[in-house]
């Protein structure tokens, strides 16, 4: 939630709910005709972000944006049209949308320190909090992630984006109770409107709870809905590895058909980890 959304809390409730739960179909169905100017601006940015997440074309993303703002420029830059660094330089000190989307851009490019610096400029911005939690967890700083979330709860209600951040803290922290808590959050969000994001969250918790068969079922459904959804593919790789020879051939075939695509960042990540493993193996064998 961007900082000046506080005054638009009721107007944007379902917009945020649908976006952060990955229920993009419901998001696109929202009637924007009676929205305030600022409410419309934020809703269009959420919708454009949803289109970007679904892999839609730049033209499709542009078509949803009727207002020219620093935020709309930032989402277009995130989609590959524009200079994000310039937008950050011009608006990063004051615009919450630019701070959030600029940080996402920097995270995608591996500039985690720059992203954290930008996020810390944001005032009462729930998504900025969630992104800081993500960076802390990526750096294995669980206590820092917990403290960041705790501080946010001093001034914010337990909005959906904070519930999701809490769930990922629980998954990284470990323990059966924490895994179950995370699973139930994703299961509740999945509800009657199943979507790839919540299905993948459930699957991740299932993997941690040593339930790879259940995880594969959720992941197959996620990929049926959104092919090339890399988070689902990553977790499917883990679930298949956990099952070993018992992994169903159908799941192996699904994974193989996607990972043969050279465009997937997942392949780059897997190749990077394979090279690291080979390096460590060589070092170990040389000292054994």
UniProtKB/Swiss-Prot annotation:
Post-translational modification Phosphoserine, affected residues: 262
| Signal peptide stretch | none
Entry's localization field: Cytoplasm; Golgi apparatus membrane; Cytoplasmic vesicle, COPI-coated vesicle membrane
The record's gene field reads sec28
Concerning its family, UniProt says: Belongs to the COPE family.
Origin species, per record, is Schizosaccharomyces pombe (strain 972 / ATCC 24843) (Fission yeast)
Q: What does this protein do?
A: The coatomer is a cytosolic protein complex that binds to dilysine motifs and reversibly associates with Golgi non-clathrin-coated vesicles, which further mediate biosynthetic protein transport from the ER, via the Golgi up to the trans Golgi network. The coatomer complex is required for budding from Golgi membranes, and is essential for the retrograde Golgi-to-ER transport of dilysine-tagged proteins.
Its record classes its membrane topology as: Peripheral membrane protein
In terms of Pfam families, this protein maps to: Coatomer_E (PF04733)
What one GO molecular function would you report for this record? structural molecule activity
Q: What is its main location?
A: cytoplasm
Name the domain of life this protein comes from.
Eukaryota
Q: Name one GO biological process term.
A: late endosome to vacuole transport via multivesicular body sorting pathway
* InterPro entries cross-referenced by the UniProt entry: Coatomer_esu (IPR006822), TPR-like_helical_dom_sf (IPR011990)
Q: Mind telling me what this protein is named?
A: Probable coatomer subunit epsilon
Gene Ontology CC entries for this record: COPI vesicle coat; cytoplasm; cytosol; Golgi membrane
């Amino acid at each position: 939630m961007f900082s000046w959304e506080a005054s638009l809390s009721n107007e944007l409730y379902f917009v945020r709910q649908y976006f952060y739960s990955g229920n993009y179909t419901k998001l696109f169905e929202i009637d924007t005709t009676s929205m305030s100017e600022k409410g419309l601006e934020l809703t269009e940015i959420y919708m454009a972000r949803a289109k970007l997440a679904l892999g839609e074309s730049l033209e499709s993303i542009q078509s949803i944006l009727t207002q020219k703002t620093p935020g709309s420029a930032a989402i277009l830059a995130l989609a590959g049209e524009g200079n994000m660094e310039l937008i950050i330089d011009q608006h990063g000190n004051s615009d919450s949308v630019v701070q959030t989307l600029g940080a996402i851009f920097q995270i995608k490019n591996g500039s985690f320190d720059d992203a954290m610096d930008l996020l810390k400029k944001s005032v009462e911005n729930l998504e900025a909090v969630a992104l800081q939690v993500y960076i802390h967890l990526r750096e294995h700083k669980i206590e820092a992630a917990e403290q960041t979330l705790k501080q946010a709860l001093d001034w914010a209600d337990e909005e959906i984006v904070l519930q999701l951040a809490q769930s990922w803290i629980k998954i990284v922290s470990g323990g059966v109770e924490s895994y179950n808590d995370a699973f139930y959050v994703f299961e509740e969000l999945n509800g009657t409107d199943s979507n790839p994001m919540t299905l993948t969250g459930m699957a991740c918790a299932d993997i941690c709870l040593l339930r790879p068969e259940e995880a594969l079922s959720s992941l197959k459904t996620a990929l049926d809905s959104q092919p090339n959804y890399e988070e689902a593919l990553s977790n499917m790789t883990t679930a298949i590895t956990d099952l070993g020879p018992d992994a169903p051939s159908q799941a192996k075939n699904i994974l193989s058909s996607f990972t043969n695509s050279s465009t997937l960042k997942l392949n780059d990540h897997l190749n990077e980890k394979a090279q690291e493993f080979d390096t460590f193996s060589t070092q170990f064998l040389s000292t054994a």
